Amino acid sequence: MFKFLKKLSTFLIVLIGILLVGGITAAGYFAFENREPINNYYKEGYNKVKQYNEEIKKVSKSLSSNELVKTLGDVESSIKEGKELTKLLGDSALESSFNQLEDSLSKVNNFSKGSTFTEVKNTIEKINQYVDEILKRFPNPNENDQFKEYVTNISQIVFYVGVSIIGTFVVSGALLFIFTKRVYGVRVSRFNPQRLLKKHLVLLLQKNQDVYDEVFES
């Protein structure tokens, strides 16, 4: 049972190693063959993030220039003029509507001048700065092909490393098979075994003549 578990664990380790190295090699090959689409996806994502950040900058600029307060002031003036007209017309219902609108506008105006509005502006500016820093850390695909070169170089390195590992295993296995042979569970050289190894093998195998002949005479 112990021998079976030992062989099973060895087999699983070898299998996992083969799958891992094979997966790394395949990933490198796939990335190299598809470096153009990968670069296009990166470029598209980069430009979208940049576009969104520009839109946020426009909002931040509008808030910083206090366009909202200016617009609210214009609306407030129009409401006052409307109230004066309703007084001349004597329409109390319309005047009441203007009063409600003026009250709502005053609340918005107070918000735009308050600390909450300032916090909103500061938060938007922080978002702009953060996104700008992120974009600076990544290659700009609109200016150069640096990202494409990264993908090409890294994929080639990964592929060749995987191929080298696989090749090492194959060559080692071939050399082991060519220069050695397994006899009764013991791997010995196919060419000119040393006398000391011969002596110890005979003692170890309890001077079994059949085994001796198999190892040294065949």
Swiss-Prot record:
TM segment ranges: 11-31, 159-179
Keyword line: Cell membrane, Membrane, Transmembrane, Transmembrane helix
One term under GO cellular component: plasma membrane
Membrane topology: Multi-pass membrane protein
Cross-referenced InterPro entries: MG279/MG280
NCBIfam families the UniProt entry points to: mycoplas_twoTM
Protein name: Uncharacterized protein MG279 homolog
